């Protein structure tokens, strides 16, 4: 029996038990088992090569201005490689094009969480703050990016637009 089937069987048994007796300990075990099942599913999804394929497909859609399709591809790439700053950055750029700034900001912050020296993360985060009208945060973010790459033309231009 596969691990997936064992998780499913355990979850079914916990749910059946809860129908008969609403025991808080059983509820806790059910939640823990569901969490373990989800983590196991996520682990099985990891495949950096497939992530690259999805990133390439996402870039192709981006260049064709098919932004919703690009988001789908980048999202699938993130599932396959959740530590790729490039894929988060690309999805952030796509969300910016869609004017979904809270989502874009979240992805930019994830880039910087994964790699605080990833300069494009500062660019994307600053752009999001700019469009969310949090100008002081945008300027601060651009300054952090410029400390890492003082000659970065994109960040300099974005900072000038914010000032």
Mark where each language-model region is.
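Alpha-helical tetratricopeptide repeat
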Residues: 1-163
